[in-house]
UniProtKB/Swiss-Prot annotation:
Family: Belongs to the UPF0325 family.
HAMAP family (UniProt xref): UPF0325
Protein name, UniProt field: UPF0325 protein VIBHAR_03240
Any one Pfam family match given in the protein's UniProt record, by short name: DUF3461
Entry superkingdom: Bacteria
Length: 127
């Protein structure tokens, strides 16, 4: 189900709690944190370093100047996709969205009704 994580030696992906990604020089550093086990003071974590891919990009076609740029390693993007499936919450369903919109609408109706009553009361005071 998670072939790239398994390839990194992570055999129980459900134990993953979160991850962090940072760049150091010409490497991306991925750190994966696991849920803290009973009796442990700190959660276990593992660190992986991926070299950044270097590409030459044409900056000025008139003078044919190129600039070296780095980008994230393709394998790392695949690992991050799998990590996002584990750590990010599932998208809300259409029914949940509809219920939220209806709830917001009912709340707005109450706010508007209250404001109208307040303005009418202010008008009565002016008479």
């Amino acid at each position: 189900m998670y072939p790239h994580l398994t390839g990194l030696g992570i055999h129980d992906p459900k134990q993953i709690e979160r991850y962090s990604l940072r760049q150091e020089a010409h490497k991306d550093v991925l750190k994966i944190y696991f849920h803290k086990q009973k009796g442990e003071f700190f959660a276990k974590s593992v660190k992986f370093k991926y070299p950044r891919q270097v590409k030459s990009v044409l900056v000025d076609s008139g003078s044919h100047k190129y600039k070296e740029v780095t980008e994230i390693n393709r394998n790392l993007t695949l690992v991050i996709d799998e990590l996002n499936k584990i750590t990010k919450p599932a998208k809300t369903t259409e029914v949940d969205v509809k219920e939220k919109i209806l709830s917001d609408l009912r709340h707005l109706e109450k706010v508007v009704s209250s404001k109208i009553a307040e303005i009418e009361a202010d008008l009565e005071k002016l008479k």
